[in-house]
């Protein structure tokens, strides 16, 4: 009796030149940058001219790899990174991603005033009531 096994390729995000990263610590926290050069196992050289991130060596523990990539030659200068970034429409792709929308929603919720939080609570109650009413009717 033979069984066919299915081998699937891993779906990991690789540390590669041209990979877009989200910085989670430091002065540029919350901004996007691109990996320009891999220094060693734990450090990469990043550059984010459109987001205002200066070219710098950063520890991989301080960034999160995003699923976005674009073609970029190794060790590219800031002007090249800027042109390739714009050509690949990285900012638009990031803004359309659910990850960016979730971050924006989290920031919006954190900025709510007490009265706005109250309004959200009332609207959620109204929504819950209409859903219960529709389910009871069906």
From Swiss-Prot:
GO terms for biological process: cytoplasmic translation; macroautophagy; maturation of LSU-rRNA; ribosomal large subunit assembly; ribosomal large subunit biogenesis. GO terms for molecular function: RNA binding; structural constituent of ribosome. Component of the ribosome, a large ribonucleoprotein complex responsible for the synthesis of proteins in the cell. The small ribosomal subunit (SSU) binds messenger RNAs (mRNAs) and translates the encoded message by selecting cognate aminoacyl-transfer RNA (tRNA) molecules. The large subunit (LSU) contains the ribosomal catalytic site termed the peptidyl transferase center (PTC), which catalyzes the formation of peptide bonds, thereby polymerizing the amino acids delivered by tRNAs into a polypeptide chain. Keywords: Acetylation, Cytoplasm, Ribonucleoprotein, Ribosomal protein. The modification N-acetylserine is found at residue 2. This is Large ribosomal subunit protein eL14A. It holds the Pfam family Ribosomal_L14e. It is found in: Cytoplasm. Gene3D superfamilies: 2.30.30.30, 6.10.250.2270. Transmembrane segments: none annotated. The keyword Lipid biosynthesis does not apply. GO terms for cellular component: cytosol; cytosolic large ribosomal subunit; nucleolus. It comes from the Eukaryota. Present with 45300 molecules/cell in log phase SD medium. Component of the large ribosomal subunit (LSU). Mature yeast ribosomes consist of a small (40S) and a large (60S) subunit. The 40S small subunit contains 1 molecule of ribosomal RNA (18S rRNA) and 33 different proteins (encoded by 57 genes). The large 60S subunit contains 3 rRNA molecules (25S, 5.8S and 5S rRNA) and 46 different proteins (encoded by 81 genes). N-terminally acetylated by acetyltransferase NatA. Its main location: cytoplasm. InterPro entries: KOW, Rib_uL2_dom2, Ribosomal_eL14, Ribosomal_eL14_dom, Translation_prot_SH3-like_sf. The keyword Zinc does not apply.
């Amino acid at each position: 009796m033979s069984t066919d096994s299915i081998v699937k390729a891993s779906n990991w995000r690789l540390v590669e030149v041209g990979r877009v990263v989200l910085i989670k610590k430091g002065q540029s926290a919350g901004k996007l940058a691109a990996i320009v050069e891999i220094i060693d196992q734990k450090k990469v050289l990043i550059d984010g001219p459109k987001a205002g991130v200066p070219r710098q060596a950063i520890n991989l523990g301080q960034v999160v790899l995003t699923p976005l990539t674009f073609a970029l030659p190794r060790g590219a200068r800031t002007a090249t990174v800027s042109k390739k970034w714009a050509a690949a429409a990285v900012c638009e792709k990031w803004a359309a991603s659910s990850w960016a929308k979730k971050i924006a929603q989290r920031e919006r919720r954190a900025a709510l005033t007490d009265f706005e939080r109250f309004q959200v609570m009332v609207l959620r109650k109204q929504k819950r009531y209409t859903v219960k009413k529709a389910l009871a009717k069906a």
